[in-house]
């Protein structure tokens, strides 16, 4: 990655909110906004925005060419961060699943549902409205292709694994096809893309290196 002339930076999202259902309300942004109803994924997205604040001040950084990536809960986070910060040129959520790139209204067999996050204890990742739709996933007033479309006309690369049924790769593909209409309307149909692989729920170095090819093509498409 570095040999291609990229700069790599990481974000410690837990400084914005602890990844712990029992303690997160006593950390980070929640100490400033104790009555806040947002989940920790939005708090983590805010942390990415603050990292971008720092990056754009560095002369070594091409501020118009910032890309972000994240896996699983990190994938949910970067999708939201990319949708809400126009300074981010390319967004790459990996295996982000429900609450991320996958649709709630279209799920493959074995995919997570909102109730799954109650079982795992991770419902605190999301806001109260999302949690209130437990057992009513398809009744949410909007679906996640909206987040895809909010990134347009900037670059969006969705990476998924065929065997990661929990993350609903079929729902991600359907969401991307819907969002592509927004890209087409803005004259950037090729700025949204997807790369699927034979594997499970992982964000391996080899995978990150392999997506540099599609990222390079997106860079050309969005002009960075």
Which positions does each model-derived feature cover?
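Alpha/beta-hydrolase fold nucleophile elbow
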Residues: 60-72
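Hydrolase active-site cap/lid region
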Residues: 79-128
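Surface-exposed acidic, glycine/proline-enriched linker/cap segments
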Residues: 31-38, 113-138
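Alpha/beta-hydrolase-fold catalytic nucleophile elbow
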Residues: 69, 94-95, 159, 197
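Alpha/beta-hydrolase-fold serine-hydrolase catalytic core, especially in secreted/extracellular enzymes
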Residues: 86, 125-127, 139, 146, ...
């Amino acid at each position: 990655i570095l040999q291609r002339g990229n700069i790599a930076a990481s974000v410690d999202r837990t400084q914005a909110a602890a990844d712990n259902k029992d303690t997160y309300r006593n950390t980070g942004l929640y100490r400033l906004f104790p009555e806040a109803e947002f989940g920790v994924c939005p708090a983590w997205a805010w942390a990415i925005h603050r990292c971008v604040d720092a990056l754009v001040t560095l002369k070594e950084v091409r501020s118009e060419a910032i890309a972000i990536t994240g896996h699983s809960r990190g994938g949910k986070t970067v999708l939201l961060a990319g949708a809400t910060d126009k300074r981010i040129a390319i967004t790459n959520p990996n295996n982000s699943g429900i609450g991320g790139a996958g649709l709630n209204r279209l799920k493959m067999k074995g995919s997570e549902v909102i109730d799954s996050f109650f079982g795992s204890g991770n419902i605190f990742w999301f806001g109260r409205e999302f949690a209130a739709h437990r057992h009513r996933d398809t009744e949410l007033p909007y679906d996640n292709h909206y987040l895809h479309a909010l990134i347009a006309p900037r670059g969006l690369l969705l990476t998924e694994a065929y065997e990661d049924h929990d993350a609903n790769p079929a729902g991600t593909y359907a969401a991307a096809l819907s969002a592509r209409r927004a890209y087409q309307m803005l004259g950037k149909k090729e700025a949204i893309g997807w790369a699927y692989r034979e594997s499970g729920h992982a964000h391996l170095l080899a995978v990150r290196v392999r997506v540099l090819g599609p990222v390079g093509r997106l860079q050309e498409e969005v002009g960075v």
